[in-house]
Amino acid sequence: MALTVKVITPDRVVWKKTVEEIILPSSTGQLGILMNHAPLLTALDIGVMRARMVNTWVPLVLLGGFAQIDNNLVTIIVSDAEEVKAIDEEEANKLLAASLANMEKAQSNREKIESMQNLRRARARMQAILSLK
């Protein structure tokens, strides 16, 4: 028996797999989930979800949301998600550099918040890419 993980965005099911273990980027830190985990509802932060399937870890970038764990079913509802195979490393590096530059230029509170969110997303994308190397 294993965990069934379903990642859902507002417009589609991004990922549905059976896994042995999952590590979620919760708002309070990394959260590991194994089979027969107690029922749980948790907020998710921008970050990399890692799923272990047959001794291979598969990363997926999550952009904030919620996860519900119940009866070996993990339902993840997020604003957006990206599979690593869809991320171009060169473009991700450029976006990270641009996000850092925008963070330094930000002056209003709104600009600072938006640039921080963009920076966190860019870092998560790079972290996911680097986890495969």
UniProtKB/Swiss-Prot annotation:
Keywords: ATP synthesis, CF(1), Chloroplast, Hydrogen ion transport, Ion transport, Membrane, Plastid, Thylakoid, Transport. The keyword Cell wall biogenesis/degradation does not apply. It is a peripheral membrane protein. GO terms for molecular function: ATP binding; proton-transporting ATP synthase activity, rotational mechanism. The keyword Kinase does not apply. Its main location: plastid. GO terms for cellular component: chloroplast thylakoid membrane; proton-transporting ATP synthase complex. It is found in: Plastid, Chloroplast thylakoid membrane. Pfam families: ATP-synt_DE_N (PF02823). It comes from the Eukaryota. Belongs to the ATPase epsilon chain family. F-type ATPases have 2 components, CF(1) - the catalytic core - and CF(0) - the membrane proton channel. CF(1) has five subunits: alpha(3), beta(3), gamma(1), delta(1), epsilon(1). CF(0) has three main subunits: a, b and c. Produces ATP from ADP in the presence of a proton gradient across the membrane. This is ATP synthase epsilon chain, chloroplastic. It comes from Cyanidium caldarium (Red alga). The lineage of its organism: Eukaryota, Rhodophyta, Bangiophyceae, Cyanidiales, Cyanidiaceae.
